[in-house]
């Protein structure tokens, strides 16, 4: 089971890293850095946010690996929290690479019984697969359209973990809403979406909202309002 699962992850990873590998090998490709001058004209809460989280000259994050532990509610109607561990690999749009991520997790359902789960956005396609012990498939959804948009939405909502990905130079377009909120638009190929970012009293992003995100209810995809909350900010690598 583990071997088969690892082979799947290796294939996905090759796809994720492909555009970045081409970029890194390109002759004369400069290392890019954040320039505070690009904040000119941004909505006030967005301007304040970048001044708070970035220093002039900060290297643009091109890729990151995140180790996670936590609990996940396995039911939409009851409290069924299960522990999980995971590794997430992210590639941003830095200097022309294609945005994407792979979340490779193990959820402990019962003692000795784990479910392997992968959630990803690679080369413009979304993927969600789950297999008991990495062998017996219990969920398998892949494709473009709303599936891809939903996974790109996850990528976009998690960008405060690597905030240079939210800069205008990285393809994000900001529009004003009020003193504590702004809308941001991101496009990747045919997939484009706009999310509402809200900023707290300290200037940090505390929520990211979408009017609708697809989620599976039984065998049908249902569009529902969606929100990601953020808190407990810490400094990493100068950000």
Regions found by a protein language model. Give the residues of each.
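Gly/Pro-enriched, hydrophobic low-complexity segments
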Residues: 183-239
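Residues that act as N-cap/strand-start positions at coil-to-secondary-structure junctions
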Residues: 82-84, 168, 178-180, 191, ...
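Short, ordered beta-strand-loop transition motifs
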Residues: 94-97, 121-122, 173-181, 236
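N-terminal mature ectodomain segment of secretory-pathway/periplasmic proteins
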Residues: 47-136
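A short, polar/proline- and glycine-enriched secondary-structure boundary/capping micro-motif
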Residues: 111-117, 137-142, 194-196, 217-222
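N-terminal leader/targeting segments and the immediate start of mature chains
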Residues: 9-65
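Hydrophobic membrane-insertion alpha-helices, especially the h-region
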Residues: 1-4
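Flexible, processing/modification-adjacent segments and terminal tails
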Residues: 129-188
């Amino acid at each position: 089971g583990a071997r088969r699962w690892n082979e799947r992850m290796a294939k996905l990873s090759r796809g994720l890293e492909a555009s970045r590998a081409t970029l890194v090998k390109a002759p004369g490709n400069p290392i890019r850095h954040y320039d505070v001058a690009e904040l000119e004209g941004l909505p006030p809460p967005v301007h304040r946010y970048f001044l708070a989280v970035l220093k002039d000259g900060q290297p643009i994050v091109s890729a990151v690996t995140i180790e996670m532990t936590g609990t996940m509610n396995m039911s939409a109607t009851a409290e069924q929290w299960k522990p999980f561990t995971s590794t997430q690999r992210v590639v941003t749009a830095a200097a022309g690479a294609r945005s994407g991520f792979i979340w490779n997790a193990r959820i402990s359902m019962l003692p000795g019984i784990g479910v392997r789960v992968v959630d990803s956005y690679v080369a413009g396609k979304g993927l969600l697969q789950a297999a008991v012990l990495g062998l017996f498939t219990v969920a398998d959804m892949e494709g473009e359209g709303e599936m891809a948009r939903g996974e790109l939405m996850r990528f976009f909502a998690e960008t405060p973990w690597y905030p240079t990905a939210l800069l205008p130079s990285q393809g994000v377009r900001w529009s004003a809403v009020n003193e504590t909120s702004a809308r941001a638009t991101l496009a990747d190929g045919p997939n484009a979406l706009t999310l509402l970012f809200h900023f707290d009293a300290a200037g940090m992003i505390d929520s990211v909202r979408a009017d609708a995100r697809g989620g599976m209810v039984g065998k049908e995809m249902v569009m529902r309002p969606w929100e990601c909350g953020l808190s407990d900010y810490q400094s990493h690598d100068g950000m």
